[in-house]
Amino acid sequence: MADTKTATPATDAEEATATPPAAAPSSEAYAIVEASGTQMWVQANRYYDVDRLHAEVDETIKLENVLMVKDSKGTTLGQPFVKDATVALKVMAHRRGPKVIVYKMRPKKKTRRKNGHRQELTRVMVESITVGGKAIS
């Protein structure tokens, strides 16, 4: 006969201190910014691809259109933007996105048109997120 183990119920103190394994750490600071006409969730020391920016490689750009900031103190929501909040981006490279095929056809006619498109992108690294002159990450 196989050994069977019975689970012991957790106490209230154990349940309060236990965290689920898939939960992200709450100390991670992030911001939601508006860049190139889109809203992006950004974190420090990560890179993102945005629509082409008019900036040279290794140039630093400051985004002031910060919609929301989350840090260890809490969440700050802008109406529409967070006051005195900036995100510093460093341009890593200019590149092109994957090719998208556009195919137009009229049925029962000999009209067919095939075009390809590659979006011009800029890869940026988030250097810092600052609120009120203090870097939160």
UniProtKB/Swiss-Prot annotation:
- Cysteine pairs forming cystine bridges in this chain are none
Q: Which GO terms describe its biological process?
A: translation
Which Gene Ontology terms of cellular component type are present? cytoplasm; ribonucleoprotein complex; ribosome
SUPFAM superfamilies found in the cross-reference section: L21p-like
Ranges where the record places region Disordered: 1-26
Pfam hit, one = Ribosomal_L21p
The UniProt similarity line reads: Belongs to the bacterial ribosomal protein bL21 family.
* Function as written in the Swiss-Prot or TrEMBL entry: This protein binds to 23S rRNA in the presence of protein L20.
Q: Which NCBIfam families match?
A: L21
> What's the protein name?
Large ribosomal subunit protein bL21
What gene, per UniProt, encodes this protein? rplU
